[in-house]
Amino acid sequence: WAWGLESDEPAAEQREQAALRIGRRFGVEVVAPPSPTIGQVRLRAPRLQPPAALAAFCTTETHDRAAHSYGKSYRDVVRAFRCEIPNPPDCVAYPRAEAEVTAILQWCSEANVVAVPYGGGSSVVGGVEPPGGDRPVVSIDLRELDRVLEIDETSRAARIQAGVLGPALEDQLRPHGFTLRHFPQSFEWSTLGGWIVTRSGGHYATNHTHIDDFVESVRMVTPKGVWESR
């Protein structure tokens, strides 16, 4: 329902103590509600089912759809904590290769389905939230596309997939003596693809403060084919 690992969630006693401190400070009664479970979430029925050719990496399960409904702004966290999810994606896809991304986008294009790319889900501006309207929505989660494909030590450049999280990216570069040296506040829970499309910056991204200072080329799969910036 918020940032971080489920295992790091404060215990009920810690939340209750925090509520007491806040209440005393502001002179109001503050109650720490229990964290909701996925069993409490009620979503509308999915408005589409993935075709058989895509079923191996697509799902309409409640947990997946709920988890891809919001980003991580305060408003998003509150709505999710209250199980207020009126507009979830109808399907979540986890492509494992470029060909599967192409297949998903072709299906979306032919079926008039909205495709929403999803990296780490750390957006605080509604970037991963499904748009309203009658069209079905597929959230395309890129977590499986998380590898450094190639490193050129001479030019100090690397080919990297969009779905890699910050720590995993650094872990793959470090054995070669390299670092991307881009550390936004969302570093642990955001992806390279998300950094690029939002022109990521932040308090911990110093000197060259935006990710586009480091980008030499982008290869992108679109509904009309593959596009490369150079």
Language model feature labels by segment:
Residues 1-230:
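Noncatalytic alpha-helical scaffold of FAD-dependent oxidoreductases
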